Swiss-Prot record:
Protein's organism: Rattus norvegicus (Rat)
Protein name per the record: DENN domain-containing protein 5A
SMART domains, per the entry: dDENN, DENN, RUN, uDENN
Task of the protein: Guanine nucleotide exchange factor (GEF) which may activate RAB6A and RAB39A and/or RAB39B. Promotes the exchange of GDP to GTP, converting inactive GDP-bound Rab proteins into their active GTP-bound form. Involved in the negative regulation of neurite outgrowth.
Pfam annotation, one family: RUN
PANTHER family xrefs: DENN DOMAIN-CONTAINING PROTEIN 5A, PINSTRIPE, ISOFORM A
Domain cDENN: 278-414
Amino acid sequence: MSGGGGGGGSAPSRFADYFVICGLDTETGLEPDELSALCQYIQASKARDGASPFISSTTEGENFEQTPLRRTFKSKVLARYPENVDWNPFDQDAVGMLCMPKGLAFKTQADPREPQFHAFIITREDGSRTFGFALTFYEEVTSKQICSAMQTLYHMHNAEYDVLHAPLADGGDQSGMEDGEGIPGTKLQRFNSYDISRDTLYVSKCICLITPMSFMKACRSVLQQLHQAVTSPQPPPLPLESYIYNVLYEVPLPPPGRSLKFSGVYGPIICQRPSTNELPLFDFPVKEVFELLGVENVFQLFTCALLEFQILLYSQHYQRLMTVAETITALMFPFQWQHVYVPILPASLLHFLDAPVPYLMGLHSNGLDDRSKLELPQEANLCFVDVDNHFIELPEDLPQFPNKLEFVQEVSEILMAFGVPPEGNLHCSESASKLKRIRASELVSDKKNGNIAGSPLHSYELLKENETIARLQALVKRTGVSLEKLEVREDPSSNKDFKVQCDEEELRIYQLNIQIREVFANRFTQMFADYEVFVIQPSQDKESWLSNREQMQNFDKASFLSDQPEPYLPFLSRFLETQMFASFIDNKIMCHDDDDKDPVLRVFDSRVDKIRLLNVRTPTLRTSMYQKCTTVDEAEKAIELRLAKIDHTAVHPHLLDMKIGQGKYEPGFFPKLQSDVLCTGPASNKWTKRNAPAQWRRKDRQKQHTEHLRLDNDQREKYIQEARNMGSTIRQPKLSNLSPSVIAQTNWKFVEGLLKECRNKTKRMLVEKMGREAVELGHGEVNITGVEENTLIASLCDLLERIWSHGLQVKQGKSALWSHLLHYQENRQRKLTSGSLSTSGILLDSERRKSDASAVMSPLRVSLIQDMRHIQNIGEIKTDVGKARAWVRLSMEKKLLSRHLKQLLSDHELTKKLYKRYAFLRCDDEKEQFLYHLLSFNAVDYFCFTNVFTTILIPYHILIVPSKKLGGSMFTANPWICISGELGETQILQIPRNVLEMTFECQNLGKLTTVQIGHDNSGLYAKWLVEYVMVRNEITGHTYKFPCGRWLGKGMDDGSLERVLVGELLTSLPEVDERPCRTPPLQQSPSVIRRLVTISPNNKPKLNTGQIQESIGEAVNGIVKHFHKPEKERGSLTLLLCGECGLVSALEQAFQHGFKSPRLFKNVFIWDFLEKAQTYYETLEQNDVVPEENWHTRARNFCRFVTAVNNTPRNIGKDGKFQMLVCLGARDHLLHHWIALLADCPITAHMYEDVALIKDHTLVNSLIRVLQTLQEFNITLDTSLVKGIDI
């Protein structure tokens, strides 16, 4: 062991590692706070030479508008004991900053000087933590040089003040104000003045314990009793060194499941540690958080933390910041915060608020500035919590936690049982606590926190000693009323057969803590009771898995979400993408058995196993029914047992082998401790030997020590794993002395982290997208829709906001990206001449004469500014953050995101104006890589704009392409068109005669599915051969092609006057320049030449029975797969039924096979055969020739449906009628009955050859079995397919 070793024992065996003293170093004098270095780097200000050896020469950090007493000065670590321990190297910079986050503070005898306690955490870059507990108090300054230096600063301040405010001297009400308080400067000067001849100067000093575990209450009591010993008029029983030595070297760390009692200066101190099968150690009062914020705000903050938003806590009290942060992270069990975690942000590290990564930080408030004056670098994804004022600002689109209402109700009931109002109590923390301090001031050792030293008295015992209460009791007793039943219960567990060894208030804190934590833990246990089923175990060895971790999918998110109740999805889909969930699953994969498991995971898995045993239903069947927590009593009992039977009492403090005469007691001054006795632990610990028989109950020390080492190794392995796998963001900033190189290195890490996160996100989205495309068959619906895609896109939007917020010169609006876009738009409009950006020609020139028509649409303008205008014209989007996200979604859907951002960043002058040199957007290489990663999104199709903004008005452009052959140009009828999509359909749109291209506007139709086109059969030549129809969304640019290749006209083809066309999306060419593709290839090219359904030996397709069977099987398989997807991810069923390879086409081929050739030029259609079969069966029914009841029912249904289709008012032609009949049969699960019926019909023998498929009973039976698989699905038809029929 180095540095004097810190005594015998290894890392886990000691309660405390260090005792630290921080304060004013009289040798170096007054130095301004570390902010000066930050100013030097960012503002490049020049240093000025000082005027006194006791005033630092670097004074650019000073604010001469503030009086010297209000300024902060640099604090130093004055002493630490021991010097160092191997298992926890002392971090002097971090300890110094966090003990006194704002440096030294000076006060006079006129100022309040109550001691302040706060806890803090030092989180290393690997994620491991050390805990600190600091008590800050004020000592009189005895150094004449320091007093003189303070006097000099006041002279300088007054001179500077007079110069700055002299012109305002006659201004009356405009006299100098200071600090925005509205108090005249002269009055404030007098109030905060310092005169060396009449004032006593005090400076802050801090004593601190550094511990391996967070025993907050015990450490606070130790420090308070030490402080009380210093301020008491009587010296303590023993020198302070004895008590400090005792807590450092002779008080052991309690093992899991054990309790410990040791001695402070004036009284015993008790702490207890949960066992390995309980919730982890947590020693902060949950009650205070709910009182400060209220239940609703706590739940909102909790949700933000789970979704890894940036969280900034804001308070005047360091301990409140720490309590809120620790409570929120403790309630996350079994998940752990994986990002930057600085509950108390030192003033010298304010630049970390610029970090473009998720963080949870606490910012100290001076109590003067309100929220509006607080300039934060980024707010798009920020949750801001003003702890003191019961106020929270939330990010947009925050999903609700599952079962939130029932969850809040359960928590509120617990709070009310403990007398805590669920809505919070704005006044509880100040006025009520002050009253308590006044009432019990003589018994309180720390006036700020209300902790009672020594053997605390219960509040009821205090009341019994009150004379007024005693008189009231006597009066009541004289009236004959018994007070026995009204006695205040002295101990909450008095009905049990044991008594706890702590005061009632402390026990109630323990009880409330564990009850609230159990309820929160129960929620996650219920929500993730079957998570193990969806963990994807790696097939390769551990090393290979670790090296390829970022490319691996370790949790089947889609299947998990498909099992969840619908209300859970918005929250769960985003939570499954967080780093904390990924780390949780990684831990699960890494730990193959209980011996290897992370302790937290072991506890959670044991609770999951217990739920599975208790629940009757199988684990994979989830329910949205709320189930209350049932583990509270068991958890409470474990704590009460530990507090009732103390497992170990540590050695009492004793006299040390000290030099006589040193450490003389002076009331009000913390003495200079003897380092020779405190820096080295006991060599042969006689005190430990003397107490050797007092072993830990139930377990010997060696076994406990082995358990500690194992847990420590598990923890270390976990951190190593996370450091290797989760390096996409900075885990923790290093708290160190600032210098330009350190700040530059930190920002460079931020830039690298952002680039890596961008690479991982794009890869994750592409793998998810293309993985789904690879398993799709038969149709072009290859897109993730619904919750999962929205989650991934929202995550990308958050990343873009963080990138655009990094290194901003001045924040303008909540969305840094939209602010940049607006600046760019303003610059472009200023540079270009008026009207040159107009794109109205596309909409206004909406009609083209038929003679000008060509087979392609006019090109759509591609412009960053035009896409911005589209977003600005959407009235539903109110905020800048919403507009930025909508613009990103639109750009992604148009496959222009990378190009638009490249164009935006091409204005280098604007970028330099908006961003500091270290900003990500000014790092050229990283910026290019970032744009390259975004370019990969062009390989897949997104509908992230169309599927989200479902109610907006969208202009659509239509192009009808008729055949130029066979007199199509002589068409005289009046055509009409109706367009249908996944979100709705248009009314019938009348097309002006001889117009083939037009634009109309309607509510978003979603992805287009069908076009109905027809005419009124008027005029001399009412015959129209339409090749195809094209429809384009003028905002997203998506173009759909609807092939036709058929006549519309009486006496032509099948005599149809209207047709239902099924279309597919055309793909666009990769971006080469701004010209759109004029002849885009099809995603799945439906043939322009329509399948020929007129039965003619010269033109019918030559498919054999095997090919027909295969096409029917693929069509049915496509429908089955459609229904096996989560509902949100299903594509177009219309395409599967009526598309080029759909069910209608496949059955058409089956009925065409072996059809006898017609005589002469007469065309015979399948519908002709069906009508004859209908006539045959109706005749049988009329003649009462019924072979069997089932046959009769099938025949009656068949005839009813054919009649209904024939009676439809629509002029859809014979092929259209066949399509309608097949769709209705599929909907009502009748197709397989009709196939059997038609195969047995005598009409079939007359109209089909002997080799026909429908006459082969084996093939027919096979076809029936295939069609029967559709029976289990509820098929809903597009209204365009069954319009005009009521059956």
